[in-house]
Every structure is written in structure tokens, then in C-alpha cells.
Amino acid sequence: MQITDIKIRKIITEGRLRAIISITIDNMLAIHDIKVVQGDERLFVAMPSRKDENGIFRDVVHPISLEARAAVEGEILEAYKNHLYNLEIENGEAVV
């Protein structure tokens, strides 16, 4: 499995939500509405989810293994940080 494209759809500067991301896997599968969230200790990736009939949020799609989760999260966070860095260079100021 290879992430072949990462699109930063939206950057958010207020609250804990930092970005909305879409990824493409193997040029065959797109996953939208992945969130970059500022946690208490670090940034993390939240996979797309829906609220079930009991009001509990359940992931719609997610990596199965810890290794796959770490790989997906690592690539997404790297792309997010690179995007912020490029915005800072373009604008001459910090974005977040």
C-alpha cells in the first residue's frame, strides 16, 4: 500500500482542528475528510467517522495494524507540516 497523493483541503487556525486532508492510495482509492488534530501532547490524525444510533463516533475507514496507522499518520503529518512551511515562505509569516 502506497499513499500516492495527499491533498490539504483546508487549514484551520482556531480550536484543536488544524486541517482537513484527502489521500489517494495506490492511485486507486481516495479517502476524504481525514482530520489533523492538535492533542494535548502532539498532533494526531483522526480518520473519517460517523455518529452511530447511540451517539458514538465510529471510524468509517481506518488502518488495521499499528504499523499501517503509524505509516499513514507519519505521511499525512509530514505533508501537513511541509504545507505550513511552504505557506510561511510564501507569506513571510507563521500560519499556525
Task: Identify the residue ranges that each predicted region occupies.
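Single-stranded nucleic acid-binding surfaces, predominantly the OB-fold ssDNA-binding core
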Residues: M1-V96
